[in-house]
Amino acid sequence: MVAVAGRPAYQPAMHPALAHIVCWIFDLDNTLYPASADLFGLIDKRMTAYVARITGLAPDQAYQVQKSYFREHGTTLNGLMAEYGVDPHDFLADVHAIEMDVLEEDKRLVDAIARLPGRKLIFTNGDEPYARRVLASVGLSESFEAIHDIHAMAYNPKPHPLAYQSMIQAFRLDPSRSLFADDLARNLPPAKALGLTTLWIDNGSEQVGEDSSHAIDYRTGDLGQWLDEIMGTE
């Protein structure tokens, strides 16, 4: 069989319940690598340092402001943009300037994603340059058609409904034939409400609450294993 660019040279035997899926959408952080890597811990420290520089506050006070922005504006970035007119590109480049030596390739996951039939997209609250660094570090730099990042969302991050609507519109997706995987259960209800099939990556980064449990169609602690199982290769 002749291979088509972006598709495997054969079509795996997909589980009947998921045979209708033609677009696979993945969150990035703590979804395509283990939550134990704790990249966000490094990013969080840089966010606090950035807030301290902008506000002139001591680190402990800056941390409190950072978290208040998150609660009141949805993200630290949105708070800084509203209160100080911060350039989002400058902020994101600064806070994402972290080492990624804790990341490594999961060959099983890389191979499983390569075998998935259909389109494959990244949907992240980070920015594209950071996402590309992560993907390169875990062996997935050539695995996805595109990255829908925080700039493309017009700074309305998941779980804001506008984030999902912008993704659907940008790639002309049919929600009823798309699946979205995320490690944060709170990010799944908006996707479910729009008709997407949902997969919760239960890796310890968040425990599911009653307000999210209804929106979980599938659940796994090992994405590579789950993909192998639904394609009949496990």
Predicted feature locations:
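Hydrophobic residues in well-ordered beta-strands that form the structural core
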Residues: 34, 122-124, 200
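Short, surface-exposed alpha-helical recognition segments that flank or form part
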Residues: 1-3, 38, 100, 104, ...
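N-terminal helical cap/lid subdomain that shapes the substrate entry/recognition surface
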Residues: 17-26, 31-110, 118, 129
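A generic secondary-structure micro-motif detector
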Residues: 37, 66-67, 121, 153-154, ...
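Asp-based, Mg2+/Mn2+-dependent phosphohydrolase catalytic module
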Residues: 2-22, 114, 127-128, 132-234
